């Protein structure tokens, strides 16, 4: 990651505007659109992490709605260092009021530059920020990232009839972060508020009204504002497509003693035998090992944590219950089970004749394709307790893919 710094000793602040309600994106249990998840993280977190990475020396001000404190705290819970670096202030009824609140929060610090950014534009990039800072360093009072309008523009009337085709030459679509010399944009905002002007749609317009020259720099086609539900869906798809695969492997091992009996249960299949496996449940050593392997992929402890042998309710229980529980934990954590592999170590009974039905049982329990389930067996060459026929051991490996981290 390349860090961007202003020229010399100039200080920089970023105001992230996140006080909107986002009605056009529709209702969601996650809250306003800046708190909805794309690529596994809330939109606002993507934006904050971007500035923290690219402008690590900048002061970060987050302007939120007074009702959104808990939403922001929850969004930042996995990022305590980032959360500790932020200054949080409450916005007003309009974006203009919210930006002014953010500017006022910087009055004591008096940074040289301030970048004002919509929290729901998480796809700004390094090159665009470099162009903005360079233009400020060159002496510009106000810098606006923008992209040329490429669509043909039509003006319509109240009857939904085209009355004019607007020449697109010289027209640009404004983006953020809109960036300024701090003292000048603060004064412009204060003057606009004193004049009762609440009709500005962006900060560059206030700068123009105040007589500042606004300089254009090249924006980014990717730096879109997430406005409606479809925007959020497309952003999530984009991040998921670009994600680095989060492939996790868990291992499990278990062993049970053989005692006199009439058969053993392995991989959920009962096999007639002159011995049985001793255990609190049905002693299915294979499913116990695989249960631990699955739990390991998401740091969820081991089988004893979830089904303690001291609990009488699990006496004689079918071990598929344990495996199903572990699989549900993995799925609830966002994981997809890709492969389950079990190696049984036993002198007897013979596993080969039952291997296929064991694989089918694993496929059924886990809800994954048969080709993703493997059962193998070997003896211990008459060595040790397994070699003496005193027990059966199992080693299991589970492969799980979780939603990846965007690049």
UniProtKB/Swiss-Prot annotation:
Region (2-C-methyl-D-erythritol 2,4-cyclodiphosphate synthase), start-end ranges: 248-407
Q: Which SUPFAM superfamilies match?
A: IpsF-like (SSF69765), Nucleotide-diphospho-sugar transferases (SSF53448)
Query: So which cofactors does this thing need?
Result: a divalent metal cation
> What catalytic reaction does the record list?
2-C-methyl-D-erythritol 4-phosphate + CTP + H(+) = 4-CDP-2-C-methyl-D-erythritol + diphosphate; 4-CDP-2-C-methyl-D-erythritol 2-phosphate = 2-C-methyl-D-erythritol 2,4-cyclic diphosphate + CMP
On the tree of life, the source organism's domain of life is Bacteria
InterPro entries linked to this entry: IspD, IspD/F, IspD/TarI, ISPD_synthase_CS, MECDP_synthase, MECDP_synthase_CS, MECDP_synthase_sf, Nucleotide-diphossugar_trans
The record's family statement is:
In the N-terminal section; belongs to the IspD/TarI cytidylyltransferase family. IspD subfamily.
* Protein name as it appears in the record: Bifunctional enzyme IspD/IspF
Organism the protein comes from: Allorhizobium ampelinum (strain ATCC BAA-846 / DSM 112012 / S4) (Agrobacterium vitis (strain S4))
Q: What is the lineage of its organism?
A: Bacteria, Pseudomonadati, Pseudomonadota, Alphaproteobacteria, Hyphomicrobiales
């Amino acid at each position: 990651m390349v860090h961007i710094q202003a020229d010399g000793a100039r200080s920089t602040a970023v105001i992230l505007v996140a006080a909107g309600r986002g009605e056009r994106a529709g209702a969601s249990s996650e809250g306003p659109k800046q708190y909805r998840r794309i690529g596994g993280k809330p939109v606002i977190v993507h934006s904050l992490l971007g500035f923290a990475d690219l402008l690590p020396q900048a002061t970060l001000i987050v302007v939120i709605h007074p009702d959104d404190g808990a939403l922001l705290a929850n969004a930042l819970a996995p990022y305590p260092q980032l959360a500790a670096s932020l200054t949080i202030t409450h916005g007003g009824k309009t974006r203009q009021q919210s930006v002014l609140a953010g500017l006022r929060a910087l009055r004591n610090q008096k940074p040289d530059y301030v970048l004002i950014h919509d929290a729901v534009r998480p796809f700004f990039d390094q090159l665009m920020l470099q162009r903005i800072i360079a233009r400020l360093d060159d002496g510009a009072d106000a810098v606006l990232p923008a992209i040329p309008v490429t669509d043909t523009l039509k003006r319509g009337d109240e009857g939904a009839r085209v009355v004019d085709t607007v020449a697109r030459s010289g027209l640009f679509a404004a983006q953020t972060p809109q960036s300024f010399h701090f003292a000048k944009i603060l004064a412009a905002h204060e003057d606009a508020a004193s004049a009762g002007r609440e009709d500005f749609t962006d900060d560059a317009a206030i700068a123009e009204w105040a007589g500042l020259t606004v300089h254009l720099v090249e924006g980014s086609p990717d730096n879109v504002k997430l406005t409606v539900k479809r925007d959020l869906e497309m952003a999530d798809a984009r991040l998921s497509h670009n994600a680095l695969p989060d492939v996790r492997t868990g291992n499990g091992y278990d062993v049970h003693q053989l005692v006199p009996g009439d058969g053993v249960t392995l991989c959920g299949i009962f096999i007639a035998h002159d011995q049985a496996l001793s255990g609190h449940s049905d002693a299915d050593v294979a499913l116990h090992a695989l249960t631990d392997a699955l739990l390991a992929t998401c740091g969820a402890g081991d089988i004893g944590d979830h089904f303690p042998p001291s609990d009488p309710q699990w006496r004689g229980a079918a071990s598929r219950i344990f495996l199903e529980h572990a699989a549900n934990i993995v799925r609830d954590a966002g994981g997809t089970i890709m492969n389950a592999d079990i190696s049984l170590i036993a002198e007897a009974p013979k596993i080969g004749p039952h291997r296929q039905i064991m694989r089918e049982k694993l496929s059924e329990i886990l809800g994954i394709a048969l080709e993703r389930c493997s059962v193998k067996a070997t003896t211990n060459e008459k060595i040790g307790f397994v070699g003496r026929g005193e027990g059966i051991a199992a080693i299991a490996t589970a492969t799980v893919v979780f939603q990846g981290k965007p690049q």
